[in-house]
UniProtKB/Swiss-Prot annotation:
It is an enzyme of class 1 (oxidoreductase). It catalyses: pyridoxamine 5'-phosphate + O2 + H2O = pyridoxal 5'-phosphate + H2O2 + NH4(+); pyridoxine 5'-phosphate + O2 = pyridoxal 5'-phosphate + H2O2. NCBIfam families: pdxH, PRK05679.1. Binds 1 FMN per subunit. Its EC number is 1.4.3.5. Its cofactor is FMN. It comes from the Bacteria. This is Pyridoxine/pyridoxamine 5'-phosphate oxidase. The keyword Flavoprotein applies. HAMAP family: PdxH. Pfam families: PNP_phzG_C, PNPOx_N.
Length: 206
């Protein structure tokens, strides 16, 4: 598949989705002004009410798409409860979108530790100081907590909190969308029955 075919939207010859996603993400990294790895994460609460928020993709391979968070946050609690989630990437500069959904699994402690240690020191302090998604009485209270944990971890490495780790979304469907004139867009969806199954490709009406 040539770069020109991808740019014009003629990407329907792809036999599996992960290589195609990797190519699109690399092009987004060259064209998007901010955060080409930004993605909308959708979950549902115990009442079935949906929630969506922007997060950052921190890795992907044939096992799935990985993001990290506080497990006590709203998204963390909801993914732990349902073990399902959906993602939507939109790269406006490229006029492309990728949607996927599937079951969720927790990454290994080794993966979580490695990523946590790669974060800036201030971000690691923040993981301890922020009671994510819970009411905050004032900005001062947050800054005070940051100062306390900064002093506590003034020397040495900052360990990963037990409540902070990563989720891997193992897609059962991945849809690639490319804008075309007159709203006659190209849509190709890859589907499978299980997270380890083979892919079936379907071209969709726009």
């Amino acid at each position: 598949m040539t770069a020109n075919e991808l740019i014009t939207g003629d990407f329907t010859d792809a036999s599996e989705p992960f290589s195609l996603f990797g190519t699109w993400l690399k092009e987004a990294e060259k064209n998007e002004v901010n955060d080409p790895n930004a993605v909308a994460l959708a979950t549902v609460d115990p009442d079935g009410m949906p929630n969506v928020r922007m997060v950052l993709l921190k890795g992907f391979d044939e096992r799935g798409f990985v993001l990290y968070t506080n497990f006590e946050s709203q998204k963390g609690r909801e993914m732990l409860a349902t073990r399902k989630a959906a993602l939507c990437f939109h790269w406006k500069s490229l006029r492309r979108q990728v949607r996927l959904r599937g079951p969720v699994e927790i990454v290994s402690d080794e993966e979580a530790d490695e990523y946590f240690m790669s974060r800036p020191r201030g971000s690691r302090i923040g993981a301890w100081a922020s009671k994510q998604s819970r009411p905050l009485e004032s900005r001062f209270a947050l800054e005070k907590a940051v100062a306390e944990y900064t002093a506590r971890h003034a020397i040495g490495e900052i360990p990963r909190p037990d409540y902070w780790s990563g989720f891997r979304i193992r897609p059962l469907s991945i849809e690639f969308w490319h804008d075309r004139p007159f709203r006659l867009h190209d849509r190709v969806e890859f589907r499978r029955e299980t997270p380890d199954g083979g892919w079936t490709k379907v071209r969709m009406y726009p």
